[in-house]
Amino acid sequence: LTCCNQQSSQPKTTTDCADNSCYKKTWQDHRGTRIERGCGCPQVKPGIKLECCKTNECNN
């Protein structure tokens, strides 16, 4: 599976994942909206939005 792994609004980069899912975490801090992308579907703390999906580059 190919997942996107760029941070926030950086140009898209991808990585090959052994997992069968990709994730996108979104949260707010003093710099504004932060986005983290990667492989798998991690646990997140309250207040962090998590989207997991199972198709190539679905977490862009």
Curated annotation (Swiss-Prot):
Tissue specificity is: Expressed by the venom gland.
Instruction: Kindly list the GO CC terms recorded for this protein.
Output: extracellular region
Report the GO molecular function annotations.
Answer: acetylcholine receptor inhibitor activity; ion channel regulator activity; toxin activity
Family named by the database record: Belongs to the three-finger toxin family. Short-chain subfamily. Type I alpha-neurotoxin sub-subfamily.
Q: What is its main location?
A: secreted
Q: Which Gene3D superfamilies match?
A: CD59
Protein name in the entry:
Short neurotoxin A
Keyword Secreted recorded:
yes
Q: What is the recorded function of this protein according to its Swiss-Prot or TrEMBL entry?
A: Binds to muscle nicotinic acetylcholine receptor (nAChR) and inhibit acetylcholine from binding to the receptor, thereby impairing neuromuscular transmission.
Please name the Pfam families in this protein's record.
Toxin_cobra-type
Q: Where in the cell is it found?
A: Secreted
Supply the InterPro entries for this chain: Snake_3FTx (IPR003571), Snake_toxin-like_sf (IPR045860), Snake_toxin_con_site (IPR018354), Toxin_cobra-type (IPR054131)
What cystine pairs are annotated? 3-22, 17-39, 41-52, 53-58
Q: Does the keyword Transcription apply?
A: no
Q: Which UniProt keywords apply?
A: Acetylcholine receptor inhibiting toxin, Disulfide bond, Ion channel impairing toxin, Neurotoxin, Postsynaptic neurotoxin, Secreted, Toxin
